[in-house]
């Protein structure tokens, strides 16, 4: 899993650069639109979920990725949850897609706020999402290192901010080295 994260995390930074996003909160829907990935609310996509036999799975998940064919995928999310949690759910599903977890005929339906014991693909999708919506280098450069500040600035829910804080604690003394991450930090700090 760590190799997957190391090889693919840069795609989150690359997307921030390609979309010109350089302020918080990061719009995960804008990222999805850039990737030409439709994002639907469960309330609008209920007929699709039922037709595909995914309705019950979706009702126990904040979000779901539905691969429809080669290069075609739809992300759906629970629109009854608050916006900060929905931002994380959509970012998490984009992580599954960018990390190659979306397989035709198999929907990802285990989306919930980060928690101990997550499977390696879930943990990897959470790490990817973290770098999209709360890039480590930017948080450290801006001094955004408390739960309250992360929640306020990045517009994420409590469990996501706890996950982000735990990753920051693991990276004390961290200095960005990837060219895309360095550029993301530079743009956010203008």
Regions found by a protein language model. Name each.
Residues 1-190:
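Active-site hotspot residues in diverse enzymes, especially metal/ion-binding acidic/histidine motifs
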